[in-house]
Swiss-Prot record:
Family membership noted in the UniProt record: Belongs to the frog skin active peptide (FSAP) family. Dermaseptin subfamily.
GO cellular component: extracellular region
Function (record text): Has antibacterial activity against the Gram-negative bacteria E.coli ATCC 25922 (MIC=5 uM), P.aeruginosa ATCC 27853 (MIC=10 uM) and X.citri (MIC< 2 uM), and the Gram-positive bacterium S.aureus ATCC 29313 (MIC=20 uM). Does not have hemolytic activity against human erythrocytes.
Protein name: Raniseptin-1
Coiled coil: none
Main localization category: secreted
């Protein structure tokens, strides 16, 4: 009888230990997934921000180009 009790306690103890280890690994996996999702979201936000800056820079370049073209035309063909 004592042997059965010890065996039962050993089985229960090992089961609880393995269960807690599995839960800990599961939590770590979930945390890693959340971090990966956040990194992906940040990447998407950064891409949007970069695109917006590139669009603004492109527009600014067009304006500067038009102004430079106008100045060059006025310099080469002065109107009297």
């Amino acid at each position: 009888m004592a042997f059965l009790k010890k065996s039962l306690f050993l089985v229960l103890f090992l089961g609880i230990v393995s269960l807690s280890i599995c839960e800990e690994e599961k939590r770590e996996g979930e945390e890693e997934e959340k971090q990966e999702e956040e990194n992906e979201e940040l990447s998407e936000e950064e891409l949007r921000e970069r695109r917006a800056w590139l669009d603004k820079l492109k527009s600014l370049g067009k304006v500067v180009g038009k102004v430079a073209l106008g100045v060059a035309q006025n310099y080469l063909n002065p109107q009297q």
